[in-house]
Amino acid sequence: KNTVDMHDFEDAKDKIYMGPERKSMVIREEERRATAYHEAGHAIVAEILPGTDPVHKVTIMPRGWALGVTWQLPEQDQTSHYKDKMLNELSILFGGRIAEEIFINRMSTGASNDFERATKMARAMVTKYGMSDALGVMVYEDENQSGFFGNVGSRTISEATQQKVDEEVRRILDEQYTVARNILENNKDIAHAMVKALMDWET
């Protein structure tokens, strides 16, 4: 091949972002279907909620460390993050696990990274960004402050206040989980159609 076309650029971009394809990996049909529902859950919630980054690609082709990927691309550079969009991003993160619960009635470990990211984001909203009405605009934790054993973070609040922080983080996560679940419960036909397409075409 003597020329480079857009397909080559797209493949290169996918490899950088998602890792190389693992075409030799043998995946059971049941697991492929579970992955398809997981990724469809992310994509449907992302498409329906307002103000989210557009879904660029959804794939169940194993790449890098993942069995599947839902890839959103912003339409413009972002220098600030806003509360409404961050809340929607939490719902998108939950979409994968909820789709597993609704459509295959099983839970996999594939959502662990989603939960970790969601928990960190919700906690930052409460403790760093002043986005909790219950706790106000005070910064409650400084994760960058060096402790006696190095950069271990610092908890500068009482146990009672920490409990309030934890309760507020839980409230935010629970509310956005409910948002995502309602979306998927009301769009089952779209989910089934998307899974069929992913099973047929992989991307």
Feature map (PLM): residue ranges:
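Soluble catalytic regions of large protease machineries
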Residues: 33-37, 43-203
